[in-house]
Amino acid sequence: MARVTVEDCIEKVENRFELVLLASHRARLLAAGAPLTVERDRDKNPVVALREIGDETITAEDLKEQLIHSMQKYVEVDEPEAETVPLLSSSPAAAAVAPQSSSDDKDVQFDRMSEEDLLRGLENLAPPTETDDEGE
């Protein structure tokens, strides 16, 4: 039974290896609960999948797209590119908007706090008070 089915399918999908990939993918879909497009006739899922491909009740191109989609781990989404903002000129207005130079950044120092100081500070924090606005 399956041999005749494979010979019917070779006319639809010329590459035997691709046929095996598509039929096995369709058989897995059938096992997962996909609806049948042909009568089962007590056949197993791989034979039903081959019969569906041979009878062209499901197209090989659709199966190929589904197979590719199922194997993708990352689906690339086309997003519009961010617009580039032109650089500001060296006008007085631009100087007022421009950030300070990096030499000023070198003078900034951060306070160091030990873990004990941090824990004491967290213990001294009061819990937030509940307000009547929460129900609104």
Curated annotation (Swiss-Prot):
> What is the annotated quaternary arrangement, including any partners?
The RNAP catalytic core consists of 2 alpha, 1 beta, 1 beta' and 1 omega subunit. When a sigma factor is associated with the core the holoenzyme is formed, which can initiate transcription.
* InterPro entries noted in UniProt: DNA-dir_RNA_pol_omega, Pol_omega/Rpo6/RPB6, RPB6/omega-like_sf
Identify the NCBIfam families for this entry: rpoZ
Residue spans with biased composition (Low complexity)? 90-102
Family under the similarity heading: Belongs to the RNA polymerase subunit omega family.
Which residue ranges have biased composition labelled Basic and acidic residues? Answer: 103-120
Entry EC no(s): 2.7.7.6
This molecule's function is given as: Promotes RNA polymerase assembly. Latches the N- and C-terminal regions of the beta' subunit thereby facilitating its interaction with the beta and alpha subunits.
- Name its GO BP terms in alphabetical order: DNA-templated transcription
Question: Keyword Nucleotidyltransferase, does the record have it?
Answer: yes
Q: Which gene encodes it?
A: rpoZ
The signal peptide here is none
The protein's name in its UniProt record:
DNA-directed RNA polymerase subunit omega
Q: What would you give as a GO molecular function for this chain, any one?
A: DNA binding
Q: Which domain of life is it from?
A: Bacteria
Q: Name one GO cellular component term.
A: DNA-directed RNA polymerase complex
